[in-house]
Amino acid sequence: MLYKGNKLKVIDLQGEQVSDMVLFNATDKREKISSGKTMDFENTILITKGHHLWSNRSIKMMEILEDTNGRNDFLLAPCSPETFQILYKNPEYHPSCFENLYTNLSQFGIEPDEIPTAFNIFMNVQFAPDGELSVDPPQSKAGDYVLFEAKMDLIVGLTACSAEQSNNYSFKPIQYEIIT
């Protein structure tokens, strides 16, 4: 739980590690983070310091107070077993952000189908003039962080991304701090 006015600091301890984050209103879990509303109301796909993360009900959920890296993604869904099968042509089982999120959020009554598009902290998604997307290595360095302030009481799901392509083919921990 993150209460209104609390701050959440997400830290890339070693550099080049993405963290997927989803948000739910703590009093009504049907209200959740929305990539579409956020990009609409912030008028950009490059969400960083000074921007807000908006809900599917057009209400501010968080504000980004600081962002030492400045590159995050809100276009791509959390990686799932299907991501590895379809996109990366990996027929073997692979752990995923989607599974990490729904498994750990189930204690709050959140089902897999309720997991929204995550705010992908430190993820470096590039887009060509023709619209083609590519996932490049994160630009984050050891110690980079994003500081958020909760605008309502929130259930926060946070995971270190397990997709090789998103993390320059290495997996590292993500640290977080809650500041009251």
Regions found by a protein language model. Name each.
Residues M1-T180:
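Acidic, Ser/Thr/Pro
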